[in-house]
Regions:
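Zinc-dependent metalloendopeptidases
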Residues: 2-325
Length: 325
């Protein structure tokens, strides 16, 4: 889909303690029935159509959260543990998006990808598989794509108008200085490749982008599920909210067991600017990222931005880097 221009910076990986990041959520506890931790999927390996396996109902919830399946309200199939036709089609679409063999079964590779840390924004929304826009989609995935849920994210595919090229961002009270610095660097990186200019504001209420760390059910309709769920999520223009999962471990430097603050910010800012997920694994808009990994902008990310309506083409000139500990 994109021209793969991939250059490597020399990454100097400095080891340090993970940052203790405060949570700025309400005091409400996480609601188990509304959250999806990914570890349960490990116990479903080997599942296939026709089987009844305890936990498949949770998998249906997982796939519905990320846009792969939708059961109408008058159907009970969403609340059972049957591996039905709709679930098989959803698994095939997921496998296709993540460059896996489209078996429709929960093989080891599929389970490994499904349990990987990822962004909480859906891959498919409003009936569109954003990871495959402009590509020929195999017929076995068509039904799943046409039966996806509609989410509050990216409804109508909104973009910031060309007249709004100077935007402000602010942090929830108590956000650490290290986190603020990392997110600011990510905004600067996007500014270097787009027409946007970003500046930090001290007014959290009036800022265009509002960044904070939250736990559990924090009032935005997309509760976090603890340390084994989504890393972060953000909302499309002009909403501007970017929420890190406060139960995850984040750090300024790539250390084992922690997620790189700036890399996660680069991804989520892409959503704030209107970008969807990419099927190019090297792109910052690829939905998942391992711990202790640094990524930068990729040509695919810039191409995606240039293909957005009301945006003047931007020349891609920065280096792209990736570093794993």
């Amino acid at each position: 889909m994109a021209i793969k221009v991939f250059q490597h910076f020399l990454c100097i990986c400095l080891f340090s303690l993970a940052i203790p990041l405060p949570s700025h959520a309400s005091q409400s506890k996480p609601k188990a029935e509304n959250t999806t931790s990914f570890d349960f999927i490990k116990h479903l390996e080997g599942g296939r159509k026709g089987q009844k396996v305890k936990g498949l109902q949770q998998l249906k919830t997982y796939l519905q959260e990320f846009g792969y399946i939708n059961y109408s309200p008058n159907k009970t199939r969403a609340n059972d543990d049957d591996f039905d036709d709709s679930l098989e089609a959803a698994v095939k679409t997921y496998q296709f998006n993540y460059h896996l063999k489209t078996t429709g079964t929960l093989d080891a590779q599929t389970v490994s990808q499904m349990t990987a840390p990822r962004c909480g924004v859906p891959d498919i929304s409003n009936g569109t598989n954003w990871m495959q826009v402009g590509k020929n989609v195999p017929s076995h995935t068509q039904n799943a794509i046409h039966t996806v849920s509609h989410f509050s994210f990216f409804k109508g595919n909104p973009k910031w108008p060309s007249t709004r090229d100077r935007l402000t961002y602010a942090f929830a009270p108590g956000t650490s200085s290290d986190a603020i610095s990392a997110v600011a660097k990510a905004f600067n990186t996007w500014a270097s490749q787009t027409q946007f200019r970003f500046s930090q504001s001290q007014n959290f209420v009036s800022a265009d982008f509002k960044i904070g760390f939250y736990i559990g059910d924090h009032g935005d309709g997309a509760p976090f599920a603890g340390p084994n769920g989504a890393l972060a999520h953000s909302f499309a223009p002009p909403d501007g909210r970017l929420h890190y999962n406060g139960d995850q471990s984040f750090s300024v430097n790539p250390i084992a067991g922690s997620f790189h603050l700036e890399t996660v910010a680069l991804h989520e800012i892409g959503h704030l600017l209107g970008l969807q997920h990419s099927s190019v694994q090297d792109a910052i808009m690829w939905p998942s990222i391992p711990a202790a990994t640094i990524k930068g902008l990729h040509a695919e990310d810039i191409q995606g931005f240039n293909n957005s309506p009301d945006v003047e083409p931007i020349r891609f000139s920065s280096y792209v880097f990736q570093c794993n500990v």
